[in-house]
């Protein structure tokens, strides 16, 4: 392969990788709150992080709550007992499993955050500022998805439109890989293939 061809291939590779990386970054930095629930060492652990835009919601009241899950109604994470309750409207699933029991987490950390799809309502840390990064966990000792009454899968609630559009996602079990990540992997494989073909030429 001539040096000019090698240089052109390198430029193509760099340009492609930068484009793909930008797409991945755009996906991961979009305002949203994501909770991943996993079975770990005989426990079930909910881990949430992100931010929430409250522009499409109305502050309702202060509440004192502890992290819990009730599959047919709501779930929350976080250690703070003091929380702000927001009312509004959103689209999303009406259940995350067949269970109906209210189960309080055995241990919890971080910012109190959650959703109730029956009211509907959002629970956020007391004094929460819209768009502020938050994170929280809830651990259910000696539990499984089945004993908590939740079904593995991905659940998403969305609200607002345009600049105020936002979402809360709960992934129960395996965490899905974003489409941009698949694009990134496909791009890398494609570049490897091109390089090999050029090398043989």
What spans do the regions from the language model cover?
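Mature extracellular "passenger" or substrate-interacting domains of secreted, surface-exposed proteins
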Residues: 32-174
């Amino acid at each position: 392969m001539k040096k000019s061809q090698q240089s052109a291939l390198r430029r193509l590779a760099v340009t492609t990788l930068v484009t793909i990386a930008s797409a991945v970054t755009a996906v991961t930095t979009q305002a949203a709150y994501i909770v991943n629930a996993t079975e770990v060492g005989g426990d079930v652990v909910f881990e949430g992080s992100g931010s929430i835009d409250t522009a499409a919601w109305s502050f309702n009241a202060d509440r004192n709550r502890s992290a819990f899950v009730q599959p047919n109604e709501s779930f929350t994470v976080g250690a703070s007992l003091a929380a702000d309750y927001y009312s509004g409207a959103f689209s999303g699933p009406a259940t995350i499993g067949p269970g109906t029991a209210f189960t309080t987490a055995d241990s919890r950390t971080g910012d109190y955050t959650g959703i109730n799809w029956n009211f509907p309502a959002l629970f956020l840390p007391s004094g929460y500022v819209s768009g502020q990064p938050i994170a929280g966990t809830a651990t259910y000792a000696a539990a499984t998805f089945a004993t908590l009454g939740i079904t593995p899968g991905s659940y998403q609630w969305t609200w607002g439109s345009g600049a105020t559009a936002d979402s809360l996602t709960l992934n129960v079990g395996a965490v899905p890989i974003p489409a941009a990540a698949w694009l990134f992997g496909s791009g890398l494989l494609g570049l490897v293939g091109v390089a090999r073909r050029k090398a043989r030429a």
